[in-house]
Amino acid sequence: MDFRNDDEAWQQIPWKHLWVYDKLILSKKLGYLCGPSGITVPTADEYVVRPITNLQMMSVGASIQRLEPGDHVEPGYFWCQKFTGEHITVDYFYGKQDTTAKGFPREGRLDRFDKWELIDREIPFPEKLGLLWNWMPWINIEMIGGNVIEVHFRYNDDFRNHNGKVIYPVWKDEDLPQPEGSTWYNSPCQDRLGFWVI
């Protein structure tokens, strides 16, 4: 089964694998400090607060919030310890590393990036995810500082239909002039129109 979109995967994969798209369960499986609405944080700090499941533009609705014991997040959301470091996305084909890119997040937002750039770096399939790669051909994993934050039963389509090494997302509510030497790649998704590709 090869999927391009998370909604296709969610509707077709066996229910026993749907935990991958439940970011709270994924975080617990990975041993992170986290909890749903109704469970408060153990210490005052900054945490990532995001929807438990969101199949389109999966960081939509995510934010960094300072929480204290006794604070509650909205129903349907969960809190998780905040990670810092490089934001990396990796495609694996039956566990073998394929397309790997580094994201440059927008300052103050978790759901937008200013650019993505292909990189040449060896990143083994995370052991904590077991043998998922033996069941699904393509698995895309996003990490921050080496910590897995999202898993998708699909490949990263953003780098599939062109030969570019760097892509600049273009958003509906922003004007991004065409960078020198770039070409347009139409790839609409939610509030994204596509990419300038170099």
What are these regions (language model features)?
Residues D2-L129, V170-E174:
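Active-site nucleotide/adenylate-binding loops and adjacent lid/helix of ATP-dependent enzymes
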